[in-house]
Design a protein with these regions (language model features):
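PLP-dependent aminotransferase-like
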Residues: 96-151
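PLP-dependent aminotransferase class I/II
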Residues: 204-284, 288-291
Length: 354
């Protein structure tokens, strides 16, 4: 604490990211990174960049990357916004589109950066409780609001909504911005991007994705939003009032290659999905209660062991998972899906513990 802090700093409770262990021998299953490397085309695209050009600023608009994303998703270039990871995109969304007189709505158990942004930007927020099975109950969002945001699938639960249900939410909230955070969409969830295609694109819907998960580029920091050009214009205004150059040359080159290599995306996503099912089956046999997941993680608890006990015991064995010391979910662990070998090591440890 310092006397030089501004008043807002005293009120902040910052987001706490998952641990990044310094010990290399640890099995890291806590931050939902891909267990596989990025596409070889990504590495080649980065290597082909002229390092002499690193003295020059990158394209502030990221036009070529926007073109690649637009072509891949069937959208127009002016429907794409780029950011330094989806967290930066979300920050601009909260400031540019969700700060209104009425409160923004989001689930009570969800991505914990949402309330942090609300506090930082002075945005009113109202959490909406998940159902008894940790499902998002869209009927509970039928109330006056200054915007609605939720991940699909939700995090940390992994539960997803069908795009048809979300389309109904959009129709009943024509005067609010609806933000669908699709960080984990490629592991079995139906994307809402088709709702944005063509002349019928709703004026109030934004879909956010990232290259950090299924495209295995968490270290490159690239995220993007897709939506109506008027929403994108608002985000560009915020970005250019904050940082006109969010993506470096190497990031833009690597991201273009990652977006274009759909075959690699589908291949490694399929591997994660298969390994996820193996883990769920093993957890069931050990007596765990696991929430149905369409993400690259599972959310699970054991009726005879507390969450913190399991977390600490696994940590002592060199396996790091995520534990949230929060109401309703304190006994749950969020476990990232690793390789088949990592999965086997985790299952063996749990068998010995249980």
């Amino acid at each position: 604490m310092s006397r030089f802090w501004s008043p807002v700093v005293h009120t902040l409770t910052p987001y706490v990211p998952g641990e990044q262990p310094q010990l290399k021998r640890l099995l890291k299953l806590n931050t939902n990174e891909s267990p596989y490397g990025p596409s070889p085309l990504v590495l080649a695209a980065i290597a082909e960049q002229n390092t002499a050009d690193l003295r020059l600023y990158p394209d502030p608009s990221g036009f070529e990357l926007k073109q690649t994303i637009a072509q891949q998703y069937g959208l127009a270039v002016d429907q794409i916004f780029l950011g330094n990871g989806s967290d930066e995109v979300l920050a601009h969304v909260f400031l540019g589109l969700l700060k209104h007189e009425q409160a923004v709505l989001f689930p009570d158990i969800t991505y914990s950066f949402y309330p942090v942004y609300c506090k930082l930007f002075g945005i009113q927020a109202q959490t909406v409780p998940l159902g008894s099975n940790f499902e998002i109950c869209l009927a509970d969002y039928a109330k006056p609001n200054g915007g609605i945001i939720f991940p699909n699938p939700n995090a940390p639960t992994g539960r997803a909504l069908a795009s048809k249900a979300i389309a109904g939410l959009i129709q009943t909230n024509p005067n609010s911005v609806i933000v669908i955070d699709e960080a984990y969409v490629d592991y079995g969830t139906e994307s809402c991007v088709p709702l944005l295609q063509g002349d019928s694109c709703p004026e109030n819907v934004l879909v956010i994705q990232t290259l950090s998960k299924s495209r295995a580029l968490a270290g490159l920091r690239v995220g993007f939003a897709m939506g109506h050009p008027r929403l994108i214009e608002a985000l560009e205004r915020v970005k250019n009032s904050f940082n006109s150059y969010p993506l470096g040359r190497l990031a833009q080159a690597g991201a273009r290659a990652a977006i274009a290599d759909q075959n690699y995306l589908e291949a490694i996503s399929a591997k994660v999905i298969a390994t996820r099912q193996v883990l769920i089956t093993a957890l069931d046999r050990l007596g765990f209660n696991t929430i149905t997941s369409t993400a690259n993680f599972v959310f699970t608890r054991h009726p005879q062991h507390t969450g913190v006990q399991l977390y600490q015991t696994l940590r002592a064995r060199g396996i790091v998972v995520r534990h949230f010391n929060l109401p309703r979910i304190a006994d749950y662990l969020r476990i990232t899906i690793g390789t088949d070998e990592q999965n086997s090591e985790l299952i063996q440890a749990l068998q010995e513990i249980i």
